């Protein structure tokens, strides 16, 4: 199923070695749909590296996931939560009294004691105000703490007076009282998380609690909070640099966090009330719950806002951000060359660039990009500079000229300088040739024009796909929004705007509410109405004009970065006249006091900026503030106020208030300490100002912690002036004395070591330095507490965000929390940023030639480090930066290095160079590799990593390494958030997939609803990613995890067969195929059914592995405990293969079942082949309809058809193959008709050929080739065009394992060439004879005697026959020339030389004797051809083997002229008709005796001649067997003048069930016997498949089985080839008779006994001499050279026309 079921509990896999296990039901509530929901705690289980089963599993209860589940999901996944009656067991409710063992009366007495002690402590605390606390008070508090540790008394301490007591104690100036308060709080909080949270919440929500708490009291509460949240949100941020946050900011964050968690608990509790279930409309929230949700959203927005400021994420908002996420499906892999959407094109200027080439941002490292540029760049291409390099600036363009092995290696002609300059590969961006760039510019212009037309409109979330990519996204496009809804803000947008309205002070708040009332018909707006208000967009734009003038700086920054402002602010305000001045006001607010700048106009601000300063412009402070404009004047005024005499408070306080609102000048002042040591005067001035500022209470609210690192830089610098250092010590001592929070900050920055080094340098002569060091040292535990707190708060916020995402998935309700997208953007920030190269390591050492070690990291693939030493002693040592976990370590090599290229590399790790004992990986490098991945995703930090080259290619000694690539972890929160997001997503959707799978297992019809279910889930994730996830990597991580957790398990379940062997999806596809006729029938329910099936299958094959194949690299295999995985990318690696494998396997099974049923029922039908082709075409169309044009499913279709064919018995398979060969023959024969019918025939032929292609590689192909060869021979020897034969063979050529039809077609080409050479040979012979005649013209008279021959006489033919009986060589040559001077219409004779090996000849006894059966003028031509062929065969350059001999056959055809008719006849018919030229009649018996033909062959030839269209009549006579043939009298039946009559005997088809098929079966069974016997004789060792084939062929020819007599009885089937043997081997492998060796698949051995149809035969004769020499058969075609007779005589005769 989806996960793993152990002990009746469902375990969800979350990654390698990680499982989630349902542990406890926490609470229950009523969901938005009115059905109960249950919150389950899922524990994270880790499987140990060693051991299996339960012994290797460790339950980490600190790691858990809280998940709300429906009742159906509980039934499917959490059997432990079900009672005996099948109902969900509710959460356990244990009262406090059940826990303790105290008697009720004793408990009541103790409660009375507690109340009296509380009253006494309050009285004693009020009496000792301002004095030392007396001992009785301390004793009372001590007793109260003891009582507080008793759990049954917890309820007494919930008295409000206890909080008053704790508040008084915590605010007491006496340390012992504050310490006692901490003890009491710890005692009360030791019972359970609920009590602890309640106490913390009650204390933290007290008004102005910060004013009553000192450092120790605040730390006590913070420690309690850290203890309370440590086990709740166990999350590690190791490797991420967290900022230094002072205690007061942390305490504020704790208050916000506790308030948010309290409201969240109230929301969950309110949903569990009984009345909530009776709500008539579950989607509509009640007033109380709606108010709670509003308060929670506002509180969560406040927490996110303060957390962003505390983490200083907002300071990075001005940095250039990555491009916006490209539109498209998050469930499909993004192509590398996807062009950005229109918004990106509008935001950035369009550079000239060609889409053909990849930018540098798409590569993981500079080395990889340099290799790409080196391999792609060609001379003449345009390039652009990406970095500043010496004389060339970034952005300069030029033309690439050449490259070499130097440094830098690339020469470019730069347009900016007008000359060439050398740069590095990785600094260039390829633009392409000029024509490519121009095309790109035109495309950019067109895109810009389109963008300009749609500017100001809301662009769609994605673009329509072209028609060639139908179903490219797994969901339908969202429905058009309601016009009325489009005119109003969504609830989330309104609540985000409402958040800023609630931030306003009283008068401003009332003014904004007044604006709302005026635009909403004066409706009275209370909190409940505000929460559900429908605000028009125009009103929201007016509010966005009003709010910036009334918000403080912090809130204004939040407003500018929020979603609603970005969506409706700039676009809506662009046409407003007040907009420019408003923007100026906002910029001024970011620099100066908001209230003051709001009153000043733009001109006043410019005048103020141009006023000359009152002080000398040459002072260091003046020069410092020059770049800050009006904002810098605050620092000058502050210095003047501090240096003036008299009362300074009135002058300094307003300036400090301005700095609190706008701290940039103050931060600049402190950061000036991190300037060069030469600025001594500036440093002293700044330190004097800072030291005086500390004495003002208002100054403590300034962000000192954000710039303390500048003080640390000055403190650590060895060149800092002693006076500056002393002033810095004074300042820091004063700052830490006033607020110990900053001592904690200094401790976190390592100030203790820096102060110790300064004391050591100045010999201890720094005043207050030791005291400052001791103070910093005492805050060590507080620094640890602060780090823990910020981790817990951040982890808690992430968990709450994940909880809101889960609620969004479950309830389909929008997320209405302000700044939710901002928080996710910062968490995902840096998802495309990696620690690269030199940021990972400190130094690189090599075994030899250290002066060339820099070549390993110079990003130049043409340079290299070459070792110098003995083989196997070369190594590269990497000293890693502390805490860096290697994500990928890659070695760059080059195959051109030949023997210098590494062949085996071992990577070791250790804590020092002397302890490199742990082998991390070993890799064998392929000779063709260029990038060798050595390590991936290490989970442990190794200070030292050594790469050892153990062996080189071709036994080389020294090695060459082209470069190193080291990728470290991503130094952002993205890896942590990705892990948590993927875990929660995986758990949620795997639980849901299990529930859906159980539904479909119980009722297959629920499969029809699966597509809508999946569509809803995937569409929701897509919309969430479009709204909240900022970049492609984050969206792809979510999409892949969702797809793997939801779709992959569902596919696995619906494709798994049940007890009957049928899977749910297979049943659905069967129904689809069986009801094809109802697809387009609107009157039936078919279209809706088919639509659902198609939508489901299109959805399931949505993700397809379309990435380019990876380069040829060596794949590392991590070993042992150092094995590591990036489980978050499991969806990428395993998803497409698993889903596609399951779906294709299911489709193959369905096709195999369909085809098998068809073959079983219809294999004997006369129209079997057309119906099969039609069925196959339906299957093909269905595959395209269901799965699109995907090769995997087409292959599954073919494999399914092949599987059905393989199940046929041999004779049935032979019958099927003969039917296909016959059908193809009929279609080719019928294609000669012409016209539309010919096109229809060709279309049917093409359809049949597609179905025949399935035979390729199957055993049936051998049988099919046998029959196709016979029918093709008859066609080639008839009047059929050979081009069609070639086209057919080109398409189904793989179906002929012996390639006999191809050889037959090749022999025709060879015959044509021989015919051309024979024509030249005849001309040469004629030239020689004419030359002789010229020399002997008196002895020979030319042409007169021969002109009297008008017809052939029987005497001449008899004489010629007599001359052949006793023939000598000279006589043969004389006979060869007897028709050279024949003056009649010489027929054209074409001879086809056919190879006996490839052409099927029925029997060699049917041979033609030209001496007896042909007239002299034809006989001489054949004799000359025989002489010509013998001479050509005897030529040493043409034939070096045994000389072939010719044997004439009766095969072939001819054209005869009979009156006005042209007769197309066979060779036998030609002989018969010519034989009747001078005979009135001839008996069939005499013809048989004279020709030596068989009766069947002669009767087959006589049949068409005696038909109604034939020229002969057959007269039956009693005394003459077979009858008498006579020429039909043509006077009775007038004939047309140029009538063409086809009399060639029709095609004779073989029967697979006859003798021919039985011989094929005998041959196959004999081969099976031989294979089994030979493998039995070799035992378990087996034989190599090539050796087995040779032994079988040898046994077939020489013995010991079968006997020669049986082989002869097989006829043509007795021939055996290696292809036949391989076909039988495949058959036996499929039956399980043979098996392959796992380690050596080319070796076969006998597996199990098998029943083989073995004939009862004897062994072959061992002494046989082998087969006869090969014979070559000949077929002649006769064509007339002259013009046919124009007139016919009364007595018609047959003349040879062709």
From Swiss-Prot:
GO terms for cellular component: 3M complex; anaphase-promoting complex; centrosome; Cul7-RING ubiquitin ligase complex; cytoplasm; cytosol; Golgi apparatus; perinuclear region of cytoplasm. InterPro entries: APC_su10/DOC_dom (IPR004939), ARM-type_fold (IPR016024), ARM_CUL7_CUL9 (IPR056405), CPH_domain (IPR021097), CUL7/CUL9_N (IPR055486), Cullin (IPR045093), Cullin_homology (IPR016158), Cullin_homology_sf (IPR036317). Disulfide bonds: none annotated. Residues 360-433 form the CPH domain. Transmembrane segments: none annotated. Highly expressed in fetal kidney and adult skeletal muscle. Also abundant in fetal brain, as well as in adult pancreas, kidney, placenta and heart. Detected in trophoblasts, lymphoblasts, osteoblasts, chondrocytes and skin fibroblasts. Changing residue 1014 to R: In 3M1; uncertain significance; may disrupt interdomain interactions within CUL7. According to a report, may not be neddylated despite the conserved consensus site for neddylation at Lys-1576. Structural study of the Cul7-RING(FBXW8) reveals that both CUL7 and RBX1 are in orientations that are incompatible with neddylation. It is found in: Cytoplasm; Cytoplasm, Cytoskeleton, Microtubule organizing center, Centrosome; Cytoplasm, Perinuclear region; Golgi apparatus. Keywords: Cytoplasm, Cytoskeleton, Disease variant, Dwarfism, Golgi apparatus, Host-virus interaction, Isopeptide bond, Phosphoprotein, Ubl conjugation, Ubl conjugation pathway. The modification Phosphoserine is found at residue 339. The keyword Ubl conjugation applies. Pathway: Protein modification; protein ubiquitination. One of its GO terms (biological process) is epithelial to mesenchymal transition. Residues 315-357, 601-623, 1345-1370 are annotated as: Disordered. It comes from the Eukaryota. One of its GO terms (molecular function) is ubiquitin ligase complex scaffold activity. Residues 601-611 have a biased composition (Basic and acidic residues). There is a cross-link at residue 1576 (Glycyl lysine isopeptide (Lys-Gly) (interchain with G-Cter in NEDD8)). Core component of the 3M and Cul7-RING(FBXW8) complexes, which mediate the ubiquitination and subsequent proteasomal degradation of target proteins. Core component of the 3M complex, a complex required to regulate microtubule dynamics and genome integrity. It is unclear how the 3M complex regulates microtubules, it could act by controlling the level of a microtubule stabilizer. The Cul7-RING(FBXW8) complex alone lacks ubiquitination activity and does not promote polyubiquitination and proteasomal degradation of p53/TP53. The CPH domain is essential for interaction with p53/TP53. Component of the 3M complex, composed of core components CUL7, CCDC8 and OBSL1. Component of the Cul7-RING(FBXW8) complex consisting of CUL7, RBX1, SKP1 and FBXW8. Within the Cul7-RING(FBXW8) complex interacts with FBXW8 and RBX1, but not with SKP1. Interacts with CUL1 (via the C-terminal domain); the interaction seems to be mediated by FBXW8; it is likely specific to FBXW8, but not other F-box proteins. (Microbial infection) Interacts with SV40 Large T antigen; this interaction seems to inhibit CUL7. It is linked to 3M syndrome 1: An autosomal recessive disorder characterized by severe pre- and postnatal growth retardation, facial dysmorphism, large head circumference, and normal intelligence and endocrine function. Skeletal changes include long slender tubular bones and tall vertebral bodies. Belongs to the cullin family. This is Cullin-7. It comes from Homo sapiens. The lineage of its organism: Eukaryota, Metazoa, Chordata, Craniata, Vertebrata.
